[in-house]
Amino acid sequence: MAKTIPRIGSRKNGRIGSRKNTRRIPKGVIHVQASFNNTIVTVTDVRGRVVSWSSAGTCGFKGTRRGTPFAAQTAAGNAIRTVVDQGMQRAEVMIKGPGLGRDAALRAIRRSGILLTFVRDVTPMPHNGCRPPKKRRV
């Protein structure tokens, strides 16, 4: 009879420490994408690997309430709370989009205690590229 090979990484052993929380991140980049319908806040390290993210929809806001400034403030607070626990002290902020949540998200980031090195607006602007869609008639 063949001998059974003992499994080293079996489920019975469980996790030997969570790998995600072991990495300390002193500096990062906070990306805020504010559209008219939703606000998405993504926190990455300086190389661009996602550490934490949150949106107004994941915070429990549904429908038109996702585009409100309060929803953006809540989403930014949720995304930043996890990275502050991982040791982030300094961050750069990139804001994209025309939505109502731009200023509210930035206000929540400032209140979190993270030192901001710079705030940059990276909203894509066409240099007369594609023709825009026709105007809405309501």
From Swiss-Prot:
Stored InterPro entries: Ribosomal_uS11, Ribosomal_uS11_bac-type, Ribosomal_uS11_CS, Ribosomal_uS11_sf
An example Gene Ontology CC term for this record: chloroplast
Region (Disordered): 1-23
A single BP term in Gene Ontology: translation
Annotated Basic residues bias: 9-23
Subunit structure, as described in the record: Part of the 30S ribosomal subunit.
UniProt protein name: Small ribosomal subunit protein uS11c
